[in-house]
Amino acid sequence: DYATIGCRYITIPGTPYDEVPGAEHFDVMLEDTAKFGVMAKLHGLQLCYHNHSHEFVRMPDGEYGLDCIFRTIPSPLLETQLDLCWVNAAGEDPVAYLEKYAGHIPTIHMKDFVGKGKVRAEGVYERDGAPFVPHEQDEGEVALRPVGRGVQNVPALVAAAAAGGTKWIIVEQDEPSLGLSRFECAKNSIDYLKDPKVNK
């Protein structure tokens, strides 16, 4: 069905909790995903895996679960759809991950957030009408924001994605924030990404 409608990429958006890295049936997930990768190729599709923060658990050998997935199921059977919010929230540098998997990230989820202990990078471009809104303690560990209103260095992420051959930047707004509707958040994010100072 995906091939019929002209879809090029299909993505595993998440896995059951008993199949995440370090869980009891992680090996089952790896086996099934490899099979899906082969099936996708037979239909001219590219299978991708979308991460969350729980893939950044350390495996017994010290490797992150996310890296274990892509080592075990190498390209071209599986590519990554990096969710840049969850890379950062897990304590890693999303620019470094874009560089690490350059050439193997056809799509990304661009998402901004604030969180306890997270500091906005110096000199991040603040577009008129899109001010940085600090974290409120009652919002939990990660509070989502429209792109450009959180801690992410969005211009650096856009540049790294472009350099690595990313085809699609997908704005994701899991929940509305700052009193804006989901559509208002999405428009704010898209307007920020279209700004020439962000998307050079």
Which positions does each model-derived feature cover?
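Active-site acidic/histidine proton-transfer and metal-coordination neighborhood
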Residues: D1-T80, K100, F183
